[in-house]
Amino acid sequence: MAMDFIRIRGARTHNLKNIDLDLPRDKLIVITGLSGSGKSSLAFDTIYAEGQRRYVESLSAYARQFLSVMEKPDLDHIEGLSPAISIEQKSTSHNPRSTVGTITEIYDYLRLLYARVGQPRCPDHGFPLEAQTVSQMVDHMLAQDQEQRYMLLAPVIRDRKGEHAQVFEQLRAQGFVRVRVDGELYEIDAVPPLALRQKHTIEAVIDRFRPREDIKQRLAESFETALKLGEGMVAVQSLDDPAAAPHLFSSKYSCPVCDYSLPELEPRLFSFNAPVGACPSCDGLGVAEFFDPDRVVVHPELSLSAGAVRGWDRRNAYYFQLIASLAKHYKFDVDAVWNTLPAKVRQAVLFGSGDEVISFTYFTDAGGRTTRKHRFEGILPNLERRYRETESPAVREELTKYVSQQPCPACNGTRLNRAARNVFVADRPLPELVVLPVNEALSFFRGLSLPGWRGEIAAKIVKEIGERLGFLVDVGLDYLTLERKADTLSGGEAQRIRLASQIGAGLVGVMYVLDEPSIGLHQRDNERLLGTLTRLRDLGNTVIVVEHDEDAIRLADHVLDIGPGAGVHGGEICAQGTLDDILKSPRSLTGQYLSGKRRIEIPKQRHKPNPKMMLHLRGATGNNLKNVDLDIPAGLLTCITGVSGSGKSTLINDTLFTLAANEINGASHTVAPHREVENLDLFDKVVDIDQSPIGRTPRSNPATYTGMFTPLRELFAQVPEARARGYSPGRFSFNVRGGRCEACQGDGMIKVEMHFLPDVYVPCDVCHGKRYNRETLEIRYKGFNISDVLQMTVEDALRLFEPVPSIARKLETLVDVGLSYIKLGQSATTLSGGEAQRVKLSKELSRRDTGRTLYILDEPTTGLHFHDIEALLGVLHKLRDEGNTVVVIEHNLDVIKTADWIVDLGPEGGHRGGTILVSGTPEEVAAHKASYTGQFLAKMLPSVKARETRPAAMANKPDARPPRKVKPEKVAKAAKSATKKTAKKAS
């Protein structure tokens, strides 16, 4: 009997509190709730983990040892599961060979298409390389004018130097009486001596004929003789019209002019991961590394003696004596600014003197001088040589700082070799197709019509390609190109690519578990994504989505709201059922926001920008940006909006952040191309807060990441008992010998390998999971040892450490960003993306800032519930009110409507985007008809504009630097009391 429900009893994974529930099968189920409430614990660590585990356990023990078997979730009973597929937000691959085309398998079909119906051409002459049979050659010639006379030629020698007397002897011996030498006809006995040092072409005249039906047999035999003599090549020249182009034939894939040939086409030839198809220069990576003059000349505003090129200034005696000798030879001043030196001098310094010999003066250790004459190697060739010859990893790492990447000059970044680049389908080579945006590629294949047998073969392949491209368009990725590297995709894009691949697979009866597929997607594209999810469901699958998007929740067949709080305060089912059930439930926070009982308010007044305090970025042209001029008001909260692929990340992350980090923080990022930047001196620090994990090992935790663990260990080292025993702060670290338990090396758990079963982690039987040895655990602060403290939640720890400012400040900021429920020693690998980002935000908040920091956040609302977003906005507005500048890339309309300033990019994604449509207040953007963001924003803003009376926190003194307004301790206390007030209101 078919089951209609997935029945779960007694689920206790992570923070789930023994929950029982029945989920309908073959429906679209949305699981929502606060960040950290237990949504992923239920969807991924319970339902998916058990579905996957059961499927894998049905395989043989031999097969299981090659698969990663998931840990058995902590629950009493579960039934009604299907084989499970999870589509998570993790980025696809860090392999530089992985592209959108290879992930979606579209590239495999393209390789097949080009191998089966592609037409190879000669790279130099453009002639089609078509192998013809003798019958085809004869038929072609018999179709010519019967009154014309022709001669059949077999090329024996092609463009080779020499007298070739031996060749003529051999032809004479074989019975040939006429030859054509360099275009002139001769009797074989009357050929003049050939010039030894000149190139010659010698063709044997095989036959002379008029094309008539009765000579078909003779002509076939002549062609066979000619092909044998000419090694598969034949030319037929008109005798009556010598100026006419010859008819060229080949029995193999080769050019009739230059003998360029190809073996039979096969899919491997078009793979940049196979030696037969990859460009030999870059091994199929498409990029070449080179020492970049812009990176080598670090400070072009300085002179060579003052350090324009690091390591070649006065501080390095050996290299500077070379520069001094160069200056004497080329008559320039070593103290002159690099930018003012003549181009010829700069060329010689960087690339060497070429053939020019220069007199160099060397100082010996004894104080003497020697003079030697030789060519100057050049700084860049010097770096290349040292990089090539060194065996020291440290030297190699140091030199890597000066290396940049550029498209491979041999293949122009296409990754393929010469042969693969010159095979055509409908007059288009493969590299030309993979650079098209997906929607244009789809149009090309829909309109593709090949004649004859090629069309029949191509039909099936083209259908598969078209379907897969269509799925990418459906999930809002029409702006991507197939050659886009996988490691440049955002988490949301990577997830939607996997989603498109799954729809392409067309499986039925499967359970899909998705993690926020709407991330990085503009409201405009949301409808198409939701259509894709319903399509997956309609195929006959159960689709379980962890999602906060309002449209997705409203569309779902079944909604599950987990809460009421986060962490230890969550793990319960607050409400479940249809949308109406959620709206009516008094316990459901989600229902309160959806019904309008609670909402994120629009500010009563907006902060005005100060025209004298604007950051100007001019002429940004990275990726798809079209000479963009960006103005960001200092001291305000600015939202960067626009449809997916419009250029937001390129403009902010690749251009603005890298530029500011290099200038202000002294970093060495590669900056996307731009013309100039003004007013960066408004800021003294730039901070990028993204959603990457705060640590990749289980030893990393919120206490270590925020820097709280150091004062914590110092505090324990000051306890009288610890001082009496002579314990240092290092004694209380679980990462070094001394205080940690050596049986488990401070992990608290011991891994037991089970081969084809999942590895089992058991608590260490020496320390019982406490990570420290007995002596260390005897040291107590107010009755708690170091292990007890790491097991505390942030709110409990704050009560304990309130009198210790260095620890309390860090704990207060964790509370401010809504992370009061996480444990201090919780493994970083168990934090969600939203939690990791807020831990980073809290770390920055806990630092004493000057009110002149530029904060850049990329989609901070990822993984956040409406209620979490409200708390996050409180933090961002607090940063802004202290005089800092906050720039947020965001699609969430609740964040956008509360911003002071919006920069909207578009109008579309990919090559149809890359321009700023409108900049201004939310009201100004909402009034802009061409802006998609404006259209959705207009529905959320009241018709009465917010009163724009209050000036920005730093606009009072236009000529002064942004002032520091509030001390962090006061801010933290104010925020804490505000949090308590909201908590009282909520209850």
Curated annotation (Swiss-Prot):
Regions of compositional bias (Basic residues) in chain numbering: 978-987
CDD domains, A to Z: ABC_UvrA_I, ABC_UvrA_II
Gene3D superfamilies assigned to the protein according to its UniProt record, in alphabetical order: ABC transporter ATPase domain-like, ABC transporter ATPase like domain, ATP-grasp fold, A domain, P-loop containing nucleotide triphosphate hydrolases
The ABC transporter domain, residue ranges: 312-589, 609-938
Keywords: ATP-binding, Cytoplasm, DNA damage, DNA excision, DNA repair, DNA-binding, Excision nuclease, Metal-binding, Nucleotide-binding, Repeat, SOS response, Zinc, Zinc-finger
Pfam families: UvrA_DNA-bind, UvrA_inter
Superkingdom of source: Bacteria
Gene Ontology terms describing biological process: nucleotide-excision repair; SOS response
GO MF: ATP binding; ATP hydrolysis activity; DNA binding; excinuclease ABC activity; zinc ion binding
Zinc finger (C4-type) stretch: 255-282, 741-767
Biased composition (Basic and acidic residues): 958-972
Subcellular compartments: Cytoplasm
Residue sites binding ATP per the record: 33-40, 642-649
PROSITE patterns xref list: ABC_TRANSPORTER_1 (PS00211), ABC_TRANSPORTER_2 (PS50893)
Region (Disordered): 948-987
Keyword Magnesium in annotation: no
Any one GO cellular component localisation term in the record: cytoplasm
Keyword set includes RNA-binding: no
Subunit relationships: Forms a heterotetramer with UvrB during the search for lesions.
Function: The UvrABC repair system catalyzes the recognition and processing of DNA lesions. UvrA is an ATPase and a DNA-binding protein. A damage recognition complex composed of 2 UvrA and 2 UvrB subunits scans DNA for abnormalities. When the presence of a lesion has been verified by UvrB, the UvrA molecules dissociate.
Family stated for the protein in its record: Belongs to the ABC transporter superfamily. UvrA family.
Name of the molecule in the record: UvrABC system protein A
